Structures are given as C-alpha cells and as structure tokens.
Amino acid sequence: IARRQRQMCIRDSDDVILRYFLKAKLPDRLVEDFFTFFDVVKSPLAIRSSSLLEDSHYQPFAGIYNTYMIPYLDDKYEMLRMLSDAIKGVYASVYFRDSKAYMQATSNVIDQEKMAVILQEVVGNQYGDRYYPSMSGVARSLNYYPIGDEKAEEGIVNLALGLGKYIVDGGMTLRFSPYH
C-alpha cells in the first residue's frame, strides 16, 4: 500500500487518485455509528479534514484539502453513500495535485501528514431548495500573532458570514480571542 501511495503522489491525476479511494471500503463498524448519527443530525453536513499540517506554525495548510458538503436526506442509505464518498474524498485530497504542490512549496513531506476527518452539522436557514449557513469560523488553540494583552496560549477565532471562503481566502473576518 505504501508503495502504491508513493506512486500516486508522483504521477496520477486527481481523478485517478479519487477513483482509487472511492473503491476502498470503510470499516463495517462505522456503518451503525453513521446511522445513529443520521438519527440525531437532521441538517446538511460539512465533511472536512483536521490534520497536523493544517495547524503548522509557519505554513498552515488551512483550505488546502477538500471539504465536501452533503445535503440532509430522508434516505439514510443514500446519506451513507454520500458520506462515505466524502470521507474518502477528503483523504484522497492529500494526494491531489494542488495539495502536493503546496506541500512541496512549503518543504513538507507527505509522510509527515496525519489526518482525521470531521463531520460538522451545517447550521443555517433554508430558503426554497437552498440551505445557507449563518456563520463560519476557524478556532486555533494557539495565537501566533497576539495583539495587545492577548497571549499565544489563549487561542484565536476568526468568524465570517456564510461559508468559510472569506476566512480561507484571507478576506475580512471578525478576529477575537475567547479570553478577551
């Protein structure tokens, strides 16, 4: 498997890489957990990465890996299929061309990366057949650029209206330390 991963890193297109990941099977023990999750969460989901390199001090990877949004459906089996594909897609995105280019530009090695996948309930309002989140945010346990009385260990939060594109793209956000 490790040899195949290295080969994928070198030559395969994003679509080929994604197809390999989509063929993989998630552990059976997760299926029951996901059905229980669907019984509790009745709104769209964001399926995101949470990785060591995303919290890197000097070259954070926030926004580099794919995030998938899936709608809430009454059909739990279709929800399971979409969730399964989204989880695999997040993991596959580590090996995508843009991710590899950023990794190389920041002198990181793919073997250093460790990743979990986060399932987040999207909180917002429905307008017709569309669903809009109210706010998005990024919270960091360390604040690398404290201002005034802030301390690095107090963390930092950036909030924006709607989806998190403003945050990832460096747009105007509300920045605050939870301690102040």
Identify what each model region corresponds to:
Residues 13:
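A conserved donor-nucleotide-binding helix/loop in the catalytic core
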Residues 20-180:
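Conserved mixed alpha/beta core segments that line enzyme active sites in large multi-domain catalysts
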Residues 1-10:
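Single conserved hydrophobic/aromatic residue that forms the stacking wall/gate
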